[in-house]
Amino acid sequence: MKDYYTWTYPDVPENVAQELLQLENSMVVVGIVGRSKCERANKMQAFGMSPPMEHTPADGQVQCYYKRGTSCIFLHFETTYDEPILHRMIEDSMADHQNAFDFDHFYEQMRSRFVRMMLLALHTCHIIVYVETGPTFDPTLVTVFQLLKFSREQHLKQFLPQMLRDTPAAKLGEKSRLCAPRILFLFENFPSDELKTRENVSAYEFQTEDNIYEMLRHHHIFTNSSPSSLVALPNNKQFVYFNAHEELHPDYLLKAIDCLNKTMFKPDMREEEEDLEILELAPFEGFCKPFGPPGERDVEAQQYKRQHTAWHFLQRHIQDALHGCFDEGSFKQLPHLGQFQLLSFPEWQGCMDTLTQLLVENAKDTNFETNNEEYKNFLLNFEDSLNYEKKFWAHLCELGLKKGISSYKSSAPANYGSATHRKLLAEATIAFEEEGRGPPAQAALARMAAICLKHWQDGRQQCEKLSLRSQPCTLPKDVPHDKHNSGVIHISSCNCGRTQGRREDPFNLRQANYDFYELIAQICNLCVKVKQYQFPIFEPSVSDYRAAAFDAAFPMLNTGKICTPQGEDENEDGETEEADEDTEEKEQAEGDNCSQQLSPTFGSDLNMSIAGFGASLNESQESSEQLSGSEHESPNSGTSSADTENELVLQIKEPARKESTPTGGFSTSTTEYLPGLVHTVSDFGLLPLFPSWSLACVGPSSIYSHNTGLQEHFQSGFLSGANFLLPWDVLLRLVHANKHHQQHHHNMHLQQHPGKKQQRWKKQGDRLSIKIFVGMEYECSRGHRFMMCAPDRVLRGGADIERDTCNKVVHSNMPLYYPCPCRSQSNYLAQLMRIHVVTPKAPVNIIVDPKVCVGKYTFTLGTIIPPRLSQSAYWILRLPFVYQGDNVMIAPPEKLDPDNPMAGGYLLPGMFGVAETDANMDLSNPSRMGSTAGTFIRI
């Protein structure tokens, strides 16, 4: 039968109340608070007491214990520091799906509830025993004591004396408590690595007492005066107890395993008399000793274990309270100056009811109203007043916010873009983090970002319209401006390549591909002299012309594809084979063959012609059949000769006396123009407003010397060693319609070139060897120019030029972008901007038809019939600076992928062709439309 009573406050059993009435004014109240791990949140196990089996712990619940024959009553406070209650509280918070789980808020709420119950214990108990499950003191308890002292001095002292005046708790007086309660510490476990001897346990208790005393004294938890102290510590009595010998909360599973282990071993038995003979076999006396009696133990250690219990530890302090010397040794003052009261059970119960209602129950009622402003402030702001960390973090974040905003504003220029704004905001964030920390840091950073954004948008924001090179406009957004400006300057050369100039970052296609070159042509003394190829452009017939809407009105129809002559694609592979028997011809001074100087009138009689490289969409069927027939017939003559295996066959037809006119007409739109560049699937009826390409003859072939390369006075900006063109030997075999015409053409060619010994072409019978010089020029935004000798190699000088070097260039995909060797950074990309061609003096014309693949588009010159290049001349084809499809601007890559250099775009191979010169053709005014202009072949 149990020797104690237990009940849940305030339901006191009648028999217990009768026994407590007999104590009169000699009842000591002991409060038990702290931590627990068992399911019933029992902290009374050290005193040999436990709640009923059906007991369920709850936050704010008080379980009372009374042992018969004693003068003390135990109040077991169940708080959020008990593990079962804390676990239930966490589950309730996690089950709230409307609000995300906030650990900081949860911890503050848990601590504030514990502090509220501790305040009740401090005002209703004489002795408080704090139970700790671990073997060490928790330093965070000092913070709890600080909060308790703050709450008592700032809140409770303001309203408790007044509100207790007309209640049963009026006997508590002005201090509103029984006394300065004596705090004791009970540790349920002793360190496992220490010996559990009397000396070790006592030494560990004394050491812990010294540490606790220093911490509480340092933080003024107790002082020399009882009224100003939150708790009291006895100086001459032990106030720390370690349970070193009793297992309070055993693990029954481990006990069962231990019992199983013991049954598996046979206990040792005493030696019998017959075993003495075995002992005589020992080599010396004492070699084998019998076991002593198993019941012998140290009497002193046994007595220490019986006396070293939590009950004996507590009774010393209870006797001090009963004998009236409770404050002796606790404070350096006279005992009668301290406040200590022993009440009867009914008097104490009235005080307990009143304080519980004021401190705990009224706080749970949200509708409770009171006229006492101090008490109302306590009920409303109690939790916020305890959250000192929240105030501390808020103060730090406020300091960091001021520092971050100051850093942002001090570094902000008059006008800046989003990139600068993000950079300044990142610097402001670093400045904020020097001071601001804690849970409100994210909200403070968001507030700082909003303030900085408002400061930026208040007249300091840039226009930030992206240029065609993805550079933002730096002009103020709020100030009207007709022309955008990014502040980025590029160095580019003119159409002829002689003059370099500074160009602003373009914001539209016209600025990029036309306006700059027209402007720099006015200051270039060569551009004004040359005659350029006139690309077909849009000519409006109305004033309200507009750009074509491709998605709605002009889908990519099959009629928009460029048609080729019948049979051309079939013979293309056979016609583009390289000649293995190219004649090696070394020229020392090619300029001696042509003495014509470049003059302002040079180029007025340029042989700019159009060859039938591709047939018009509306060409007559007869012209196509005639063209295809001439190409099919040419390989049939001479196929038995082994020497002509790799030769290009060019069939010479009889000169036509009258140019035939195409039977079908072709009309272009005069009300809608092509907004981008011409590509392979764009509508033939749409023309651009301006040409994005440029084709110009900059002089005779003699201005280029292969010994010296391109000179600086002629082509400026080339890197050293990268200013050479690549020689290209092409072997042709002429096939005439009949012998009469063959003899006629032979005599005509002899008359055209009398007495010419050094020429870049040789004719031996029906074979013709010509030499062409080709250069693929790349130019970076810093104005550096260089030639390429392979798709993945920059020309480094004459040593890089071999016999088949040019074949690698003209018969391979050439990347549109390539890293400039002037810088190691990948962001300096050079772009394929010009193609240099030096034509031979042979009676043939070189034809150019470039095709540039960028993204899903394949851009072309926009002419149905590609241009012819005149003989013995230096031609330069300038490519677009920016490419645009059907209302889709294609920006250059930020950096080049080494594994895929063609990702940014590339020039297709097979852009060159050769055709027989036709003297009867009118070449002065080439147009987009025309008839077939003689026999041609791709090279």
Curated annotation (Swiss-Prot):
Span list, region Disordered = 561-600, 617-645
One family from Pfam that matches here is Smg8_Smg9
Q: Which organism is it from?
A: Drosophila ananassae
Task: State the organism's lineage.
Answer: Eukaryota, Metazoa, Ecdysozoa, Arthropoda, Hexapoda
Q: Which intervals carry biased composition (Low complexity)?
A: 617-629
Q: Would the keyword Ligase be found if you checked this record's keyword annotation? A: no
What name does the UniProt record give this protein?
Nonsense-mediated mRNA decay factor SMG8
Return the InterPro entries for the record: SMG8-like
Q: Which family does it belong to?
A: Belongs to the SMG8 family.
Acidic residues composition bias: residue spans: 567-587
Q: What does this protein do?
A: Involved in nonsense-mediated decay (NMD) of mRNAs containing premature stop codons. Probable component of kinase complex containing nonC and recruited to stalled ribosomes.
